[in-house]
């Protein structure tokens, strides 16, 4: 039975806080930052080490992915955890923007905060220090742009993927082949295979740049994606706002015991509440996605989706309304697999007729030939690529679940790095690009026209951006400062250290390259978050009443005064519990 939502009012009570100020606050933040950076930093470079993570209710996970390590670390001390959370934010932002470079971003933010903290402790003005950090960040980006080169060949694409996958030639070749088959803007996705070997398969599919309308639709919490199998597809060229707009499709999907994908101009109000409530209650699995494009472009793209999935687009222009009496199961299409992330929807093996899809493709080709306007032609070419390009699926194989998950993490990193390289070009890898950028900051840090505290901020960034190269060398068993000194002495943006072989080489010729977008995102996010941390003067966390009670009892404090403290704490906890229960009962009423 389909259920509708009932408006509820939820009350939230305040909790006691712990506050620390000045040096005490920054010391606690720094402790959390340093411990997190130490754990993440060991994974950097081709000879970086793995980290083994305890997983609740599952076997341990072995990974070399910086953001995975960062997200798994929690500290008992709330203030230390506060600092670690800020660095985790840097890793997360970099991962969202570029899909890779999380370890570099973590190392940079930790170094900038640590040196900035020391400077503030010695009397430097924190606001001027941040201005210097921001100035240095802009100059580093200029230097990186001057060093970057476009990606022009399949071999360069393969090399970028191989480096990001920890020098795995097989993964590099698979991603190079996948991009060759579906194009640089094509869709490449991963899934767990059923054999020992990792394989590449090209399937019918299309994608568009729109994500889920609510995080409550997420089914894979680790990847933050909604994944649906054998889904029904409902396409509408209008806003769905009332229950009547979505009820017929929901009822049919529940009867068929199949998930439902809704693609419409928007899904809001009662329609969204009803869909979400029944999803949360477990009556139906599904997802709502906004339609791509605007105006006539949106109508055309919705029609492309309808043809691919075998659905009929609901549009009043076509004489089709959303009235219950007009609904028919023929309006719904099908799709073998749907993957929806925060900003992309991928449809694989739609239920549309192959003849209808081919006719649609030919129609778009004819429109491209007849179109004179460059902008319109580009949009038509995009539609053609999405409808006819297919989806490359990398099926990850392995002997165990641990091996498959570890390899899948590396493939996803390699895919993201490769896409970043294609979009914004490449730099010499191994931290060489950032070392060369530090030379640009050398002259700025000596500019006497700048206030001393701003120059100090520039110097902090100059020192920090040399650390990735040092970490890579240290993890390879070589003295990092010696390697950095030799590379800087050459002042050649293509000259660097190959940590895999222990040789100094031309990084581009050796295929040791980093995507410009990845390095840029790491620098920008690290400078932004670390700069804000330096200017922190107070830190506020919630008091742990239950934890304090346990500590007092464990220490065997038996005098009356301390027993009264325990009783008081118990009373506070019990009152808080009763208040929550009363609020919950009120909400149910």
From Swiss-Prot:
InterPro entries: Cpn60/GroEL, Cpn60/GroEL/TCP-1, GroEL-like_apical_dom_sf, GROEL-like_equatorial_sf, TCP-1-like_intermed_sf. PANTHER family: 60 KDA HEAT SHOCK PROTEIN, MITOCHONDRIAL. Belongs to the chaperonin (HSP60) family. This is Chaperonin HSP60, mitochondrial. Its main location: mitochondrion. Induction: By heat shock. It comes from the Eukaryota. One of its GO terms (molecular function) is ATP-dependent protein folding chaperone. GO terms for biological process: protein refolding. Pfam families: Cpn60_TCP1. GO terms for cellular component: mitochondrial matrix.
